[in-house]
Each structure stands twice: as C-alpha cells, then as structure tokens.
Amino acid sequence: MNDKTSQSKEDKLKEARKTLKPKLDAMRDKWLAKKADDIQLAADSNHSKDVYAGIKAVYGPQSSGSSPVLNQEGTALLSDKKDILDRWAQHSNNILNRPSSISDEAIESLPQVDMNHSLDHPPTTKEVEKAIKALSVGKAPGADAIPAEVFKAGGPGLVSKLTELFSSVWAAGAVPQDFKDASIVYIYKNKGNRNSCDNYRGISLLSIAGKMLARLLLNRLLDHIDYLLPESQCGFRAGRGTADMVFAARQVQEKFQEQNREVFTTFVDLTKAFDTVSRSGLWKIMTKFGVPDKFSALVRSFHEGMQASVSIDGDVSESFEVTNGVKQGCVLAPTLFSIMFSGMLKNAFPDDEDSIPIKWRTDGGGLFKLSRLSAKKRVHHGHVRDLLFADDCALNARSEEAMQRSMDKLSAACEAFGLTISIKKTEVLHQPAPKTNPEKPTITVKGQCLQTVESFTYLGSTLSSNVVIDKEVESRIAKASAAFGRLRNSVWERKGLTLKTKIKVYQAMVLTALLYASETWTVYARHEKILNRFHLNCLRKLLHIKWQEHIPDTEVLERTKLPSVPTLLRKNQLRWAGHVVRMDDSRLPKQLLYCELAEGERSLGRQKKRFKDTLKAGMKDFGIDPDSWENTAANRTSWRSSVNRGAKKYEQARIDEAKMKRALRKSRSSSNDTQTPAGSFKCKSCSRTFTHHLGLFSHSRTHTTSN
C-alpha cells in the first residue's frame, strides 16, 4: 500500500480513503452531537465541572509537560528528556512537600462536635453501588491501568467482591499501597511562559478502585459535616455551584448601591492552598468536627506513605514520598480542605463583628413588595461577611477600617493554620457610595499594601466597582469569540458535519461561554444589543451567509431554530429566580435576593436598575404574573413549562415585529423611489445629487463628521 510507484496500489489507497472518509465523518458527527447534548444538559443543570470536562474533550488534548523547561534557578533551558523528567519530579517534590503546621492553640479554640460513631460502620453493598455509579467514564486510570468502564460493567458479582474488599480494608484500618500512589501529568494553563513549570497544572492519576473507596468515605463524610460547614461555602457541595456565589456577590453590590452605602470586597488568594495543608493538624480538626478515630484513620491511610511519580510521554520519574497537603485528584481533597478552612474561619471570626447586617423576609406579598420589610414581626436578621468556593474567598465589609480589621484577623488565622496569603494576587474592590468621590483605600497584610482594582474576575465572572456589567459583557464576547475561533477548522469548516450538529456544538461551546453567569446579571438594552449582534454574526458565519445576500436577522434565527439573546437572557434569569425561590430560607442567595441592608436609605426619585427590575420586566415579557410567580416557581416542572412557553411567545413576537418594521421600511423606500425622479436627491451642503435617498443619507454623515 505504501509503494508509490505502483499505480494499482495507489488507486486502491485512494479508493480505501474515499470509502473510509464518509464513515469517519459520520462517526465524528455522531460523537460531536452527543458531546454537545451532554454539555448543554450540564450547563442547564449548573454542573460547571461537567461543562468544562465536555469542552476540553471537544477541543482535544492540551499541551503536556513534554516541552523544554527551565531549570530550578530559571537560568538554563533543559531539552534532554531525562533532564526534563527530573526537573518535573523536582518541581513536584518541592510543591507537594512544603512544610506547614497548625497551631495546637488554634485547634483547641474550636468547639467540639459530638462524635458520630455511625461513620465507623462497615460499608454496605448499596454504598458500593452508589460509589461505582458516581465514577466518571473516559478518565485516565492510575498505575493499575483498570478504567472505570470495567467497574461499571462488572455487575452484581463485582459489586459483591468489592464490598468484601472494602470491608477488609475497613477492618484493617489501612488501604493498599496502590490506592495511595499517584502518577502526575502536567498540563499547560494556556497563560504565561510555556517553559516555566509554574505555568502548568498537575493532574494526579489514581487507582479507580481507590477512587471508589474514597467516594464511599466522602458520601458518609458529607452527610455528617454538611451542616457544620459555613452557609457561604459553596465549593463541591451538592446543589451548590459558582452561580450561587457570583449571584451573592452581585446582590451585595446592588444592595449597597441602592441604599447609598460604600462596600469593600477583598478577594483573597492563598498560595498553593491544597498543597500546604498540614496533615497532622487536619486530623485533629476532623476530631473537633466529630469524626471518630476509625473513620479518620482510613482517611489518614490514603495520605500517609503516599508515593508519587511524574509521567511524560510514557517515561516515568523516580517516585518520591508526599508528606503534606490533601491528596490532589482525590474526591476527598476538596471536602477535607473545606473542613480545615472552615476551622480557620471560625478561629478568625468567632462573632459577627465587622460583618454586614441584613434583614429579609420571604413572605408578606412577594419579592416586589418593599413594604413587607417594614413589619415589626416576621422579619429575619442576619449577617454577611465571606463568600466562599473551595479556597476562593471574598471578604466584605462596610468601611475601610472594618475591612482592615477583618484582613488582620484572617491573616493571623491563616498563619496559625499554616496557610499563606499571596500579597501579589490578593486584590481589593472598593465600591464607593453613589455621588461621592472618596480616596483610594489602603488595605494591608503584614504591612504590605494590597492592590485596589476597579474590576475583578470572581469565579469566571467580572465584577466592577460601578456595578454595571459593561466589562463583563466585553469579557464574555472575547471568550466566546475565542471558543468560536478554536472550532473553525474542526467544526464550522468541516464538510462532513451536518448543520444540526454544528448548531448543537455552537450552543454548547459558544453560547455557553457567551452567557456564562448571565442569570445573575442586571441587563440594560445596550448589553442585549451587543450580545445579540455577536450571536447573529456567529450564526451568519456558521451558515456561510455573505452580507451581499441581504439576509435579515429573523431569517438567520429561523434557519438555525435558535432564539435571540434577549430571549435567552430572560429565560436564564427566570429559571434561576425559580431555583432561588425553591431554596431553603437559610441559603445565602435567597436571603440576599429578598433582603435589604439594616443600614442606609434609598434616594428619592427613580432608582438605578436592579436585578429584580430586570426580573420583573422579563416576567411581563413572558406573560408571567409578577404578583403570583413565586407560587408557580415553587414547582420546578410547572415553572419551567411557564418559562419555556413565555420564551417561545416572546421570541415569535420579536420576529413578527422585526418583519413588520422591515416591510414598512421597504414600502416607504419603494414609495419614495416612485414619487421622486432619479437623480433628484440633492445634498444641501455641497449640491451633489444621488439616485437613491440611502445614498444621500450615507453622504450626509461625511459632513457631520467633518464638522
């Protein structure tokens, strides 16, 4: 087949390629359509982890750590394979074995929770089945090379054997060495110097069987500690996600603007937070959280004696022991970190001093009735200080002095718990009270001044000190444009893919990036217009429509069977509002939606637009009664049906209105052309004549510009 001098063989090769190509195109089309459906479902369910995993699969593998890297001093570039492997092993060893400790005095200050001895009970068959079901397929396994698909297809017989294995591990109080060890691969972060090890992210490949046991432990641990974690912690907890904290942050900004108060928010960055957790201190904190010794010993066993090695293109470095930090790549790691971080926050802030007092009421006439908060009874009072997502921490305060005191307390607690605040990456966002011009604040950590910024990207969404989403819209368009560009050759220009599949990929990859966290936005008409213009431009490129064809926007939307951005925004926000309404009253997003500050007053006259104003307008556009919407939203199925019906009617009304306006413009133009002889459109400034009024209109703008 490779003999190029043989014409018959070359013809056979061409024929084989011709036969194979349609089959490969069909397979790719089917795979992309399925992956796009999965991404869209994850996006609709606010499962951000699954969204990003799907996006990575579509984009393909990222650059790994096989390229030349700088030595530890940063003075020489290493190109030899063995030198590169040794450098990565050295880098990993330095990161994963940083010494840290937690003060015994700080641990003793934490309250003791009653021991939950039910955690010590041996695992059951149902728990093993649940752990297997939670496994993610398509993931690289550890050193044993047994993928998750094998366990998922094993059936009852394998479940029984695994239950026996896990029970014996439970009785021994120690896990096998294979369950502990990790193989580390490095992926470039797509920012910074590609030759610097610091700009790569380490991924730990672990034994799938060990992951199942860790998942079993996690399921039990979550049931026990969920009520012990702060309400503001939304990282890696069921029913919570990044949208909760982005929404909370925007609501804090709006409430302070509405009631003419200033607010300070410090976004705290911790240096290698997961890798610097003191293990000995963590076990003691777990005891304080009511975790019994036997269960704690099993968790410890996953960490103590752990060996790791670096893998690059099939080559493996010498193994080294990992003595510090929670086990990266293990499902237990985020929860173990949250336990330690929760203990640190309790130590830093034992009371509500310097927090933000709020009052709220979820009954009394609904969200849009302000008088409900004037009642002397049934009004709840609370406080807001921190917004958390794993190790992402945003501290809020009402004054510069309160912010400084809070940072002093947090800094002292971090030092006591072995954590380090990154001065370079920690930033302050100051939102001054309306119609004031205050001086730039000075917030310090250990005598070093923190940078004050006008905007900050928090959990992927840009917050601005002026409480508008202009910069967020710019950022979203930039990210969506990059996503669209990355798929140009692999999807948009590929002839073997159907239009239906391309549209599915566009929805999952581009629209998801464009409208990320849009459910939390307070939207003005100008934002809708800019976003919709980008949306339609992408669809025109996808359909290969040229501007000379004069295809109206309505036809573009009808061809692709996609709604406009204004419809999508209203739909996202109303669905999110229903989700918030169904939350328990103890949840922070719900409290902030229904609350007002305990201090401060609204200005007289027209108020600046708020999220609930956007929400109310969306309800009216969708034909939903603003006075009774909460009753409908209490039922998820009924609410979604109402929102979907409203979206369909609103989009059709937009299309009909646009068509009517276009027809009216054409009729006017035709009438003018009939009544006015050719060449009689004359410029008043320079006497130039035109055959059509549109030419005169375009020409007249040159005089406006020159003036």
Feature map (PLM): residue ranges:
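Short, conserved micro-motifs composed of acidic
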Residues: 118, 366, 371, 421-454, ...
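Conserved catalytic palm subdomain of right-hand nucleotidyl-transferase polymerases, strongest
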Residues: 128, 138-146, 195-205, 243-287, ...
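Basic, alpha-helical interaction scaffolds
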Residues: 390, 445-521, 537, 566, ...
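Conserved pre-motif C helix in the palm subdomain of viral-like polymerases
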Residues: 198-229, 244-250, 274, 323-357, ...
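Surface-exposed loop/turn segments and immediately adjacent short secondary-structure elements
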Residues: 37, 42-197, 204, 211-212, ...
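C-terminal recognition-helix end and immediately following basic linker
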Residues: 694-707
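Arg/Lys-enriched, amphipathic patches
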Residues: 1-78, 117, 121, 134, ...
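Catalytic palm subdomain of template-directed nucleic-acid polymerases
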Residues: 2, 272-289, 325-326, 386-417, ...
